[in-house]
Amino acid sequence: MERNLMIAGFGGQGVMTMGKLLAEATSEATDLNVTFFPSYGAAMRGGTANCYVVISDDPIGAPVSYSLEDLVVMNGPSLHKFIDNLKPGGNLFVNSTIVTDPVDRDDINIIEAPVTQMSIDIGNPRALNVIMLGVYVGATNAVPPEVIEKGIAHKFAKKPKLIDPNVEAFRMGLEIGKAQAK
C-alpha cells in the first residue's frame, strides 16, 4: 500500500500543520513509512502553500509524486493548479466553503466538506485543517483515526485546553469522510 497525498491552499489555512500532523502521528504510532515535504509560495499567510505526504508499507523512493492518489484543495487556485496531477480513480477533497468552481473530471471521487464554515460554526476558525484531516481519514482509512487523535493530543500537550476541541473537530470531519467514502 502506498498513498501519495498533496494538501494545497493558502498560507494560514493550516495546510502544513495538517500534513505534518498526519505524517508525525503516522510515524509515531504505526509501522508505516512516511515522508512529509513542504512547499511554500512567496508569502506565508495568504500566499500559496502545499505539502506532500507519502504513506507506505514499503520504503519510499521519492518524497514527492506528481501522480497523486489523493488531493486536498482548500482554495480555488489549488484546484486549478493541481487537479491534473490526480490519478484516475483518485480522491479529490474539496473545501466547499471556498472552492465553488465545478470539477471537470468524471474519473475521480470528489469528497466535499464546507470545512471553513464548519470551523466558524463551532467557534474554532483555525480548526478547518483538523476537520479536513478527519474527512481525509474517514474517506480513505489511510490510518486508523486513533492515530490522529493521539497526534492531536501530542501536538497540543502544552496547551491541553485545545486537545478536546480539536479532537471533536477531527471527529466531525471523520463522519463526513465516512459518509462520502467510495
Protein language model regions, located:
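Active-site cofactor/cluster-binding pocket
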Residues: 1-182
